[in-house]
Amino acid sequence: MATFVQKPAEVEKKWILIDAEGLVVGRLASIIANRLRGKHKATFTPHVDDGDNVIVINAEKAVLTGKKYTDKKYYWHTGYPGGIKERTARQIIEGRFPERVIEKAVERMVPRGPLGRRQMKNLRVYAGTNHPHEAQQPAVLDVAKLNSKNTRSA
């Protein structure tokens, strides 16, 4: 019996909707990364993009545990000498694009490379409750019911 290897033409992608309100960011990102990669499927093949399309709503209401809300820093470099910049998670969540906290958490859990970049394009994160993907009829995934540790009261 030969090992099963899925071909790109055989991939069936579903649309998943996750409400991030009250969910712990790291645990949520781990679940999203597995869904994007397709590791939850029996047909998982490491070199094929067979993950699902994931829609995350209420990203601004996701929760960081401990003192990460005030102490966690996100760094980037402008490319100029002395151009290291930083922002705390609090500044990002209270800023214009609070969805970037979840995007960065998931991005750092997906492999870096051409396949990882293609899988990240299947992630759509929205700060509020509205999303333009009603036509895809996404199935709702209740992450809070998967494990009691996935939620944290604010």
UniProtKB/Swiss-Prot annotation:
The keyword Ribonucleoprotein applies. Gene3D superfamilies: Ribosomal protein L13. CDD domains: Ribosomal_L13. One of its GO terms (molecular function) is mRNA binding. One of its GO terms (cellular component) is cytosolic large ribosomal subunit. This protein is one of the early assembly proteins of the 50S ribosomal subunit, although it is not seen to bind rRNA by itself. It is important during the early stages of 50S assembly. Part of the 50S ribosomal subunit. Belongs to the universal ribosomal protein uL13 family. This is Large ribosomal subunit protein uL13. It comes from Sinorhizobium fredii (strain NBRC 101917 / NGR234). The gene is rplM.
